[in-house]
Swiss-Prot record:
One of its GO terms (cellular component) is plasma membrane. Catalyzes the sodium-dependent uptake of extracellular pantothenate. It comes from the Bacteria. Belongs to the sodium:solute symporter (SSF) (TC 2.A.21) family. The lineage of its organism: Bacteria, Pseudomonadati, Pseudomonadota, Gammaproteobacteria, Pasteurellales. The keyword Membrane applies. The gene is panF. GO terms for molecular function: pantothenate transmembrane transporter activity; sodium ion transmembrane transporter activity; symporter activity. It comes from Haemophilus influenzae (strain ATCC 51907 / DSM 11121 / KW20 / Rd). This is Sodium/pantothenate symporter. One of its GO terms (biological process) is pantothenate transmembrane transport. It catalyses: (R)-pantothenate(in) + Na(+)(in) = (R)-pantothenate(out) + Na(+)(out).
């Protein structure tokens, strides 16, 4: 166990817990629900940018994505840059409308907005179930990614690393709530930027420059330096599918959408869009390029997801590697804490308080219940992550796709189409998510596109058809009422 690596990590985690304690103090002075779930809607532009980019740049950006770049070469780096406009697109499409609606209705969760917009409790229940299932899969990926990092860098077993990571995330989310999440996201986003730059420079330096690195990759496999990767796998259908899955479809991710309910004002939104796009550009290019070039430094890795932690040890001095370890840890922690908060809000706000609204008056009990739910979820995730796959990116993309198939049209058409109704939303959610799971489990790719593409098409058709049928049913009901 190398103290040079561990010491900076301990210092960093001290800052994280400090932020959580600060958030806890703030929480005790305000309304619990508003403070715990949306940080009293007080995010500045810089904080909004960092928390949105940090939440998006998860284990896949720092572990799974570079692992795929290690395996498939520079073509995957090009593919990864598709994700650059994500912050601009998500905040631009949802920002102002979500902010206005959430303030007007005092909404704290995505389901609050769904109930206000569609006036249907069954939609909220189905939404809650879909969210919990998809978040559980997505959070499992983050736990695996965090454990992989600690396992490789500080030399402990995978199980020990998993327990250490889970303990850290569970405790500071338990203490601090949403404000702790966005404060640590801001710290983490800054660490991510510098860590990415340092590792990329260290990798290129170890290889004797970019030209030398590319030559070494060519010697290993000439396909590693082509845009299409080994066996031409990165074809048009793959790239188009990937763009929909990790860029356009991100508008339908609820834990990204909830950020649009918590910023301070329009100035914060516009600044957040600009800064967030710059931050994501640096992270995506730097980490994936480091992963691809890492093949020339360490050509014989059996688990490609270990490329970043192995590179850290190989090309950086121990103290610098320790500082950089905080970067991917930051990315993973910032994603999982956001999803833990969202999952907790589903149980507490959308299910418990909707069934017992009078319980909201007892803030101490609600606070206790929220924290207990967070700890139970953390414990369940530990069990789910005990047997990890070799490449976590596919599991993460599966969770991404599930959320998008269920929620993209419900969110977008709900805020941009006045005639959208609950029948259309329910139809879209059931058909979109159902077809995605079915196509994925059966391994069916229509016209060689990823399953998310036909699922979104089916979901849109279902929304339009369900909406039309719903209009007729609503008209019949109105006629019966007026005839009385």
């Amino acid at each position: 166990m190398n103290l040079g690596i561990i010491l900076p990590l301990i210092i960093y985690l001290t800052f994280v817990f400090g932020a959580a304690i600060f958030a806890y103090v703030k929480r005790t002075k305000g309304d619990f629900l508003t403070e715990y779930y949306v940080g009293n809607r007080s995010m500045t532009g810089f904080v909004l940018a960092m928390t949105t980019a940090s939440t998006y740049a998860s284990a896949s950006s720092f572990v799974g994505g570079p692992g795929a770049a290690y395996k498939y070469g520079l073509g995957w780096v090009l593919l990864a840059m598709i994700q650059v406009p994500v912050v601009w697109l998500a905040l631009g499409a949802l920002g102002k409308k979500f902010a206005l609606l959430s303030r007007e209705t005092n909404a704290l969760t995505i389901n609050d907005l769904f109930f206000y917009r569609y006036k249907n409790k069954y939609l909220v229940w189905l939404s809650s179930l879909a969210l919990l299932l998809a978040f559980f899969a997505a959070m499992t990926v983050q736990f695996i990614g965090g454990a992989r990092l600690l396992e490789t860098t500080i030399g402990i077993s995978y199980t020990q690393a998993l327990l250490l990571f889970a303990l850290t995330v569970g405790i500071y989310t338990f203490i601090g709530g949403f404000r702790a999440v966005v404060l640590t996201d801001t710290i983490q986003g800054t660490v991510m930027i510098f860590g990415t730059i340092i590792l990329l420079i260290g990798t290129i330096y170890a290889l004797g420059g970019v030209e030398s690195a590319v030559n070494k990759l060519t010697e290993i496999d000439p396909d590693l330096v082509t845009p299409y990767g080994p066996n031409g796998m990165l074809d048009f259908q793959f790239m188009a599918s990937f763009w929909i899955l990790v860029c356009f479809g991100v508008v339908g991710l609820p834990h990204t959408a909830v950020r649009c309910m918590a910023f301070k004002d329009s100035k914060a939104l516009h600044r957040g869009m600009l800064i967030g796009t710059i931050v994501l550009s640096i992270i995506m290019l730097g980490m994936h390029l480091a992963g691809a070039l890492g093949r020339a430094v360490i050509p014989n890795l059996t688990v490609s997801d270990q490329v970043i932690p192995t590179l850290m040890i190989k090309v950086l001095p121990p103290i610098v590697a320790g500082i950089f370890l905080a970067a991917p840890m930051s990315a993973i922690m910032s994603t999982i804490d956001a999803q833990l908060i969202q999952s907790s809000s589903i149980f507490v706000k959308d299910l418990y308080l909707s069934a017992k609204p009078e319980a909201a008056k007892n803030e101490k009990k609600v606070s206790y219940f929220s924290s207990i739910i967070t700890l139970i979820l953390t414990a369940l995730l530990i069990f789910a992550a005990l047997n990890p796959p070799d490449m976590i990116i596919w599991l993460n993309l599966f969770a991404f796709g599930g959320l998008e198939a269920a929620f993209l049209w419900v969110i977008v058409l709900g805020i941009y189409w006045d005639k959208a109704n609950a029948y259309g939303a329910l139809s879209s959610m059931i058909i979109g998510l159902g077809s995605y799971i079915l196509l994925t489990q059966l391994g069916i790719k229509l016209f060689n596109f990823h399953q998310i593409v036909p699922s979104l098409v089916f979901g849109l058709i279902a929304f339009l058809v369900g909406n039309k049928l719903g209009e007729r049913r609503i008209e019949k009901t109105q006629l019966k009422v007026t005839a009385l």
